[in-house]
Amino acid sequence: MSKELPKTYDFKNIETSMYRWWWDKGYFKPINDPNSVNHDPDHKPYVISIPPPNVTGELHLGHAMFVSMEDLMIRYHRMKGIPTLWVPGTDHAGIATQMLVEKALAKEGINRRDLGREKFLEKVWEWKDKYHDRIVAQIRRLGASCDWDRERFTLDEGCSKAVREVFNNLYEKGLIYRGERIINWCPHCKTSISDIEMEYEEKDGAFWHMA
């Protein structure tokens, strides 16, 4: 007795099961892994580190665009037989995450400064743990063929240590120094912020001419 075909394409179940099958078969792993006994050092790899999305909630269309583009490049090189690796990860987001955590605490009537540094950092890590899984699930849902066994977080001990070491080396070489500069200052966070973190607001004002 023949089975009736569904009237609509059940993309959620079909694509989820296909993605799981790809992963279980190890198709997202590099074929020339340096840890393998068959490693060929002359076989040049193709590696991309994913621009890590911030752990600030959910992905947006911009993330979907770059994930699709990078996945296209990764799959293209993989199909050519080139050792291919796509390293996934997420970013702690710094001030952006801090602001969201502060807003969440404010709803509970809690102030960051009253909470103290250590307790506040605990709240930040709780936020990361909560939204990290959602973001990773969304990246997987997009079909990203990353090697998830190599996933990193920008505040992982290894990453943090590497950043501190490079920063210290640059400082000792005199390439990092303090000086008087015009900066963007946030009176709420009591810290400097970058240009891309600025939110501009247009206001009507007077235009003065000096005779």
Question: Model-found features: residue ranges?
Answer:
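N-terminal, positively charged nucleic-acid-binding surface of large information/translation enzymes
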Residues: 1-211
